[in-house]
Amino acid sequence: MAKALSNKQTNNLYSIQDEHKQGNRNLLEIHYASRDWTSKHPGRHNGETHPKTRDLVIQPRGLRIRKWHSCLFPWGTRLTDRCTLQMECEPDGAGVRPVAGDVAGPEESLQLREADLKEIRHPKLHTTGRSLCSERDAQRCHLRRQSV
């Protein structure tokens, strides 16, 4: 999975690490990668087949917890409608905008709103059994996730 990540995303993570060294402990490491998977959507478009999934890893800096989230493409609508964690992306530096429609790939930097950071800092998230998304794909939830 690590090979699927681009060098450009790695460069984005370096700037986050530099900010972290300057004392900002509230930053999150966010990694995501696409991989082939054919499955039926469990949500409102029941029976619709999607050829890809995107694996998203959210890891608060300084903590040894890592949260996985898997969404079927197109995943922007799924994040907005189904998940408690709302994401925003800033692909061109023109300003943060809500995720909607297709998101091109790992070269985009991802940001979380301050309200969502409070959600992640909540002590209940330290339990290993909690999932970020209430809608889980039962066919894939048993798969082991590999570190990126």
From Swiss-Prot:
Cited InterPro entries: Birna_VP5
Cross-referenced Pfam families: Birna_VP5
Instruction: Name the family.
Output: Belongs to the avibirnavirus/aquabirnavirus VP5 protein family.
- Write out the function statement from the record: VP5 is not required for viral replication in vivo and its absence does not alter the virulence characteristics of the virus or the establishment of persistent IPNV infection.
The name on file for this protein is Protein VP5
Q: What organism is this sequence from? A: Infectious pancreatic necrosis virus (strain N1) (IPNV)
